[in-house]
Amino acid sequence: PCCSKLHDNSCCGL
């Protein structure tokens, strides 16, 4: 998932 630190977590709202 994109909310993982191993991926682009920009979709988490960060």
Curated annotation (Swiss-Prot):
Alphabetically sorted, this entry's keywords are: Amidation, Disulfide bond, Secreted, Toxin
* Presence of the UniProt keyword Transmembrane in the record: no
Any one GO MF annotation of this record = toxin activity
**Principal subcellular localization:** secreted
Q: What are the annotated GO cellular component locations? A: extracellular region
Per UniProt, subcellular location reads as: Secreted
Locate the Leucine amide modifications and list their residues: 14
How does it get modified after it is made? Contains 2 disulfide bonds that can be either 'C1-C3, C2-C4' or 'C1-C4, C2-C3', since these disulfide connectivities have been observed for conotoxins with cysteine framework V (for examples, see AC P0DQQ7 and AC P81755).
Tissue localization of expression: Expressed by the venom duct. Is present in all duct parts with a highest content in part 2 (proximal of the venom bulb) and then decreases in concentration toward the end of the duct.
Q: Looking at the keywords, is Disulfide bond present?
A: yes
Further comment found in the protein's record: The name has been given by ConoServer.
According to the UniProt entry, the note on domains is: The cysteine framework is V (CC-CC).
What is the name of the protein in this document? Conotoxin tx5e
Organism, scientific name: Conus textile (Cloth-of-gold cone)
Q: What does the record give as the organism's lineage?
A: Eukaryota, Metazoa, Spiralia, Lophotrochozoa, Mollusca
